[in-house]
Amino acid sequence: MVSWMICRLVVLIFGMLYPAYASYKAVKSKNIREYVRWMMYWIVFAIFMAAETFTDIFISWFPFYYEIKMAFVLWLLSPYTKGASLLYRKFVHPSLSRHEKEIDACIVQAKERSYETMLSFGKRSLNMAASAAVQAATKSQGALAGRLRSFSMQDLRSIPDTSAPTYQDPLYLEDQAPRRRPPIGYRPGGLQDSDTEDECWSDNEIAPQPPVRPREKPLSRSQSLRVVKRKPLVREGTSRSLKVRTRKKTIPSDLDS
């Protein structure tokens, strides 16, 4: 464990940070010789990092593995040994020059295939998203229609008729007292339907009703047009006064004769 931590520190400091600063100085000074040297180092170090990924998995159990790795990084970086330039000139450059065309063709094919795969993946994802949205919309519509159908007329009639809440003034509680609802079939004139009257009251409480009289025959048209003429009543006093007056007039005629 200690050797692994020391190895990681050596690779981080001497394998990455110091070469990065030296490359910056070479680019700034525009020294072509130093620029080429550090470019060769970075190529070799990239290959070393790729190989290290697999060797740490399969060969890390080998004794003195981390010590050998630290020594190899220092050998690549040392200006006395110039291990990076040596490996590049003898192994890396000849192998890359031999397989350069094949590597370029593979890179071009990889770019084209990656572009095509990205397009196909994007189309599939859009189709899947559209189908999912359509299915969700249809399911929601079906659920809404089912809920609306479940409400029958009986369910709607069974909803209690709750009146809206009203504000009650504490000073006028008597005027605002709720009135009792009249019984079913009640009419404001004191009249009630016969059917509702039987429903509201029991048999013992119902008042006995008089028998219904048969209706008289309607008058005919001729009878309705006749007018009954009555003789005017003559007072007895007036008739007697008239008789007396007539008698008084006839008396002097008898005396003359």
UniProtKB/Swiss-Prot annotation:
Chief subcellular location: endoplasmic reticulum
Domain of life: Eukaryota
InterPro entries found in the cross-reference section: TB2_DP1_HVA22
Modified residues (Phosphoserine): 152, 194, 202, 253
Record-annotated membrane-spanning stretches: 1-21, 42-62
Chain segments carrying region Disordered: 159-257
Keywords: Cell cycle, Cell division, Endoplasmic reticulum, Membrane, Microtubule, Mitosis, Phosphoprotein, Transmembrane, Transmembrane helix
Residues bearing PTM Phosphothreonine: 196, 250
Alphabetical GO biological process terms: cell division; endoplasmic reticulum tubular network organization; mitotic nuclear membrane reassembly; nuclear envelope organization
GO molecular function annotations of the record: microtubule binding
Coiled coil: none
Compartments in which it is found: Endoplasmic reticulum membrane
Cellular compartments per GO CC: cytoplasmic microtubule; endoplasmic reticulum; endoplasmic reticulum membrane; endoplasmic reticulum tubular network
Entry membrane topology: Multi-pass membrane protein
Family to which this protein belongs: Belongs to the DP1 family.
PANTHER family: HVA22-LIKE PROTEINS, RECEPTOR EXPRESSION-ENHANCING PROTEIN 4
Purpose of the protein: Microtubule-binding protein required to ensure proper cell division and nuclear envelope reassembly by sequestering the endoplasmic reticulum away from chromosomes during mitosis. Probably acts by clearing the endoplasmic reticulum membrane from metaphase chromosomes.
UniProt name for this protein: Receptor expression-enhancing protein 4
